[in-house]
């Protein structure tokens, strides 16, 4: 049975609108990932946005529960039901039907469509929900209905937000399979398995814990697809179902092991984590040191460790990820389109971790022999595994699990000191929606006229302080927000900064517009008051001249993305952007740095479109029609049914609500000024056009003239070559080897800094001079510290030593056991690096 299609078809026949799965990265600052089907409907439930014309919805939503409040990562592989990524089937009512219909629909689908026997079904309800009990008694004997408290049967998304009592459908998997003392209905055992949760959304909980009735009672339900699939196939573990069979076969082929072996938990971890990695990478979450990217990194590294347990010492997960992409490509087409990029990025991240995995495992296994009688693992060692070898703390705890041990958390936290809690770094901060509820109830969305004009006459509907509390009057020197009846000011969005400008009253400057933002469909402008203004005042709103320069950079960004896709391939997609009056910044998915030839091609393509003077065209059309025309869209963006499409003839077509030039000739010229990496799999281009392009060219010409003067040569290249030759000749002079040499237990130890010379050559000379050697030499050059280290006839690995020291300098190293090099940009930490290098060597020699 195709459960997904069966579910959606059932509810479509019941008058529900079918919604696609929203991105795993939600447009919600309070959530790390989309963790439930109701996330995309949250603003409807709270009344922030109006309910849709069809007040019934159903979806099959991809969800992630790893990191943040809802975190199942540590349980995956050890239980029958936990997953990091799973699919949640759900039906929703926005003030339409309530408990009676929700219960009726659920019972019909479970018993008729899925075919579960009524005698095997049990129901839980909230202890105060007598109404639900009476409704269930129509289908289920009262002795199979159990009342439970808030802990089990009151659902809420977070500490605040929509919530309400819930009712759950359980299935008895059979007494013959479960003999534990907790295997009774309501117990902690697995015999009675929850399959569907019906939430009766009646309240909203405020930040201070107060429950308030929602505008209209609603329904939110959730049923795990993986769980239902296993039950229909009479499997007691989700991982034993046909959904996971292709992955288990691939893992078995890679390892040479049987799924039904002692390594079964590791099979399950790898299979689960491969799904999460595939979908997150395909949805443009990239490996990073913080936030969602760090959660992704933790998932991958946990999978690699379980692969290591099964004897896999080389990159392998990318192959399993490839199977995931193929398996789900018929439902999620983007997996097929991005398969090559996803596998490549996964492979490269695996290679990075495998460089340190072996050394980290050696340290871990050695430390296990020193466990105290309470089986507490040294927090300092756990921190070293985390900081030096890249082992996330939960990975170390996972490894300790089979030994009945755990990390000394106090010791770990002491070592961590006040480092940023990485897994929350990119999603902290909450918008207090309650503050806007009153505004949204009082004001309709204001009219934006900025596409047609940069100036208009408008009434000031209201003024608001920094907390968006309404004020009656705005006085000179205050900074306040204004809501205009209609506005020419474009609100920040699509990477473009918000418009600035001026408000005039009675032909006098009344306020400077510092910024413009959109909150829940209302365009607010931030003002610096020059002359007193009050609610109802009529003003002239005028956009500043920098609007045109912003438009130039915005249009250039569209041309840039098109050029990148032509030069690098269709896998390129936007990962972020910033559009200002003097520059643009564009982040995009690509696995490696662009070379000079590629950058030149991209720049030439953009300028070619500028010189063609292509006319811009703006159209409004249904979303599906726009996609059929080939319009580029942001994966993470949630679009309305009808969208605005901006095109420059054959050169570019994108979904965009921003301001653009009328024809590309107005852009003037385009120059790439920098290409860099943002994170694994994400590159960044910074560029200028328009006036900024002219100013850059002017400054470069001035510098060129100065260079000719300093070199005393009109041929700058020839002058530079002559200077380089002179420097090269001066460097050939022998460099003093005044490096301190200490003899420790018969080993010559050298730790020092030089001002000039080839430090690799110095290491070679030291190795030829001494029979037993530990040497590390630092050199400051080009605002960086570089280092080289050599080992001779001493049981210490140079690459591990160099890498550990490089961490303090903000870098990393690599090389062989007998020679390694490294570098970092944190020059101020040079003395600390010297101290660490020496202490590490001394500790090794004395140990």
From Swiss-Prot:
Any GO molecular function: tRNA binding
Binding site for Zn(2+): 554, 558, 656, 660
Function: Catalyzes the attachment of alanine to tRNA(Ala) in a two-step reaction: alanine is first activated by ATP to form Ala-AMP and then transferred to the acceptor end of tRNA(Ala). Also edits incorrectly charged Ser-tRNA(Ala) and Gly-tRNA(Ala) via its editing domain.
GO cellular component labels: cytosol
Cofactors that this protein relies on: Zn(2+)
Pfam families named in the record: DHHA1, tRNA-synt_2c, tRNA_SAD
Protein name (database record): Alanine--tRNA ligase
Major localization listed first in the record, in broad terms: cytoplasm
Keyword flag Glycosyltransferase: no
Entry-linked CDD domains: AlaRS_core (cd00673)
Annotated domain remarks: Consists of three domains; the N-terminal catalytic domain, the editing domain and the C-terminal C-Ala domain. The editing domain removes incorrectly charged amino acids, while the C-Ala domain, along with tRNA(Ala), serves as a bridge to cooperatively bring together the editing and aminoacylation centers thus stimulating deacylation of misacylated tRNAs.
EC id: 6.1.1.7
Domain of life: Bacteria
InterPro entries: aa-tRNA-synth_II/BPL/LPL, Ala-tRNA-lgiase_IIc, Ala-tRNA-ligase_IIc_anticod-bd, Ala-tRNA-synth_IIc_core, Ala-tRNA-synth_IIc_N, Ala-tRNA_ligase, Ala_tRNA_ligase_euk/bac, DHHA1_dom
Protein family per UniProt: Belongs to the class-II aminoacyl-tRNA synthetase family.
Gene Ontology biological process: alanyl-tRNA aminoacylation; negative regulation of DNA-templated transcription
Location(s) in or outside the cell: Cytoplasm
């Amino acid at each position: 049975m195709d459960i997904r299609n069966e579910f959606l078809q059932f509810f479509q026949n019941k008058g529900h609108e079918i919604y696609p799965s929203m991105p795993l990265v939600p447009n919600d600052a309070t959530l790390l990932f989309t963790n439930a089907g109701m996330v995309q409907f949250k603003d409807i439930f709270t009344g922030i946005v109006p309910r849709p014309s069809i007040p019934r919805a159903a979806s099959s939503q991809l969800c992630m529960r790893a990191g943040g409040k809802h975190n199942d990562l540590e349980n995956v592989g050890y239980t029958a039901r936990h997953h990091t990524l799973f699919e949640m089937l759900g039906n929703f009512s926005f003030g339409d039907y309530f408990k009676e219909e929700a219960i009726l629909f659920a019972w019909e689908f479970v018993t008729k469509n899925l075919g579960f026997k009524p005698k095997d079904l049990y129901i839980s309800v909230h202890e105060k929900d007598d109404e639900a009990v009476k409704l269930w008694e129509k289908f289920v004997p009262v002795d199979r209905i159990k009342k439970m408290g808030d802990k089990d049967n009151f659902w809420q998304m977070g500490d605040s937000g929509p919530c309400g009592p819930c009712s759950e459908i359980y299935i008895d998997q059979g007494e013959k399979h479960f003999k534990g003392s907790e295997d009774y209905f309501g117990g902690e055992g697995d015999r009675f398995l929850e399959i569907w949760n019906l939430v009766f959304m009646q309240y909203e909980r405020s930040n201070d814990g107060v429950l308030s009735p929602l505008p209209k009672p609603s329904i939110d339900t959730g049923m795990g697809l993986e769980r239902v699939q296993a039950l229909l196939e009479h499997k007691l573990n989700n991982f034993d179902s046909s959904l996971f069979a292709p992955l288990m076969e691939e893992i078995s082929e890679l390892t040479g092991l049987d799924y039904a072996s002692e390594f079964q938990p590791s099979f399950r971890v790898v299979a689960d984590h491969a799904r999460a990695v595939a979908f997150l990478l395909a949805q443009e979450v990239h490996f990073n040191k913080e936030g969602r990217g760090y959660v992704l990194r933790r998932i991958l590294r946990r999978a690699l460790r379980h692969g290591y347990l099964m004897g896999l010492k080389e990159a392998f997960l990318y192959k399993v990820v490839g199977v995931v992409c193929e398996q789900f490509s018929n439902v999620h087409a983007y997996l097929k389109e991005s398969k090559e990029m996803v596998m490549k990025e996964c492979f490269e991240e695996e290679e990075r971790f495998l460089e340190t995995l072996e050394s980290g495992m050696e340290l871990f296994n050695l430390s296990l022999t020193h466990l105290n009688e309470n089986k507490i693992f040294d927090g300092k060692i756990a921190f070293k595994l985390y900081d030096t070898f890249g082992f996330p703390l939960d990975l170390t705890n996972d490894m300790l699990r089979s030994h009945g041990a755990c990390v000394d958390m106090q010791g770990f936290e002491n070592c961590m000191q006040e480092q940023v809690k990485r897994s929350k770094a990119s999603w902290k901060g909450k918008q207090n929606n309650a503050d806007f509820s009153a505004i949204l109830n009082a004001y309709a969305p204001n009219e934006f006229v900025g596409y047609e004009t940069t100036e208009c006459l408008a009434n000031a509907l209201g003024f608001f302080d920094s907390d968006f509390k309404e004020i009656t009057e705005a006085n000179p020197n205050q900074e306040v927000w204004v809501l205009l009846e209609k506005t020419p000011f474009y609100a920040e969005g699509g990477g473009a900064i918000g418009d600035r400008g001026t408000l005039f009253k009675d032909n006098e400057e009344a306020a400077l517009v510092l910024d413009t933002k959109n909150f829940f469909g209302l365009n607010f402008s931030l003002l610096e008051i020059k002359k007193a203004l009050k609610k109802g005042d009529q003003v002239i709103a005028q956009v500043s001249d920098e609007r045109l320069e912003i438009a130039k950079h915005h249009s250039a960004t569209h041309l840039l993305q098109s050029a990148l896709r032509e030069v690098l391939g269709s896998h390129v997609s936007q990962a972020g952007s910033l559009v200002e009056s003097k520059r643009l910044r564009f982040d995009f998915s690509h696995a490696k740095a662009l070379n000079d030839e590629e950058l030149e091609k991209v720049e030439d393509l953009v300028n070619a479109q500028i010189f063609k003077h292509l006319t811009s065209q703006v159209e409004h059309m249904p979303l599906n029609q726009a996609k059929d025309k080939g319009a580029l869209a942001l994966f993470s963006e949630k679009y309305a049914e009808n969208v605005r499409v901006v095109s420059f003839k054959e050169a570019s077509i994108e979904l965009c609500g921003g301001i653009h030039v009328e024809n590309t000739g107005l852009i003037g010229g385009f120059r790439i000024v920098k290409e860099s990496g943002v994170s694994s799999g994400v590159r960044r281009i910074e560029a200028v056009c328009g006036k900024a392009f002219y100013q850059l060219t002017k400054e470069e010409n001035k510098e060129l003239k100065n260079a000719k003067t300093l070199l005393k040569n009109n041929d700058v290249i020839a002058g530079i070559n002559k200077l380089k030759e002179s420097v090269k000749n001066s460097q050939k002079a022998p460099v003093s080897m005044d490096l301190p040499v200490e003899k420790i237990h018969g080993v010559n130890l050298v730790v020092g800094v030089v001002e000039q010379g080839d430090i690799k050559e110095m290491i070679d000379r030291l190795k030829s001079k001494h029979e037993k050697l530990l040497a590390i030499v630092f050199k400051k050059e080009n605002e960086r510290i570089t280092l080289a280290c050599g080992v001779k006839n001493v049981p210490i690995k140079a690459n591990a030593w160099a890498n550990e020291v490089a961490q303090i300098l903000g870098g990393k190293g690599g090389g062989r056991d007998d020679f390694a090099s490294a570098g970092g940009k944190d020059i101020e930490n040079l003395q600390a690096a010297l101290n660490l290098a020496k202490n590490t060597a001394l500790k090794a020699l004395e140990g």
